[in-house]
Amino acid sequence: MSRENVELVRNLSEHFVATGEPAWDMLHEHVEVRDHDIMDGREYRGHADVRRWLFEDWASAWSAYSAEPEEFIDVDDERVISVSRVKATGRSSGAEMERQDAIVYVVRDRQIVRVDYYNSKQQALEAVGLSE
């Protein structure tokens, strides 16, 4: 099953890069998202809340943004880490940023039920009990 989960996450990532939209059918209707890069650390639940996180809360900081998937790590039967090279320009500052971000996905019954966004591969690995 874990190989199928890696492919699901890869397809989700490719869809987002190509369209700028999540593949909503791959996200459970009650998906939970936690962005560990946002100060308030609030949890987002469901498609409408995920849309707000992506296109309002998170995106409001950037005037330009791109992410290119670099690696997919099969953690266990439910979890996959996606590592991406992120480039962004600050909306207020104009400062350019490039870093490697990582997302821990939890997959059940061929749908993503939880997303944890980290601003480094190391943070994501530590969150699942691994290290480089």
Per-range role (PLM):
Residues 76-86:
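A short hydrophobic beta-strand element
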Residues 22-78:
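A solvent-exposed, acidic/Ser-Thr-rich amphipathic alpha-helical stretch
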Residues 50, 67-73, 86-87, 100-106, ...:
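Hydrophobic/aromatic beta-strand elements that line small-molecule binding cavities or substrate pockets
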Residues 1-30, 60, 131:
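Short acidic-aromatic low-complexity motifs
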Residues 102-126:
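Short beta-strand edge/turn micro-motifs at domain boundaries
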Residues 60-63, 88-98:
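Short, cysteine-centered beta-strand-loop-beta hairpins and adjacent loop/turn segments enriched
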Residues 44, 92-95, 123-129:
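A short, polar/proline- and glycine-enriched secondary-structure boundary/capping micro-motif
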Residues 33, 79, 97-104, 127, ...:
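Intrinsically disordered, low-complexity linkers and terminal regions
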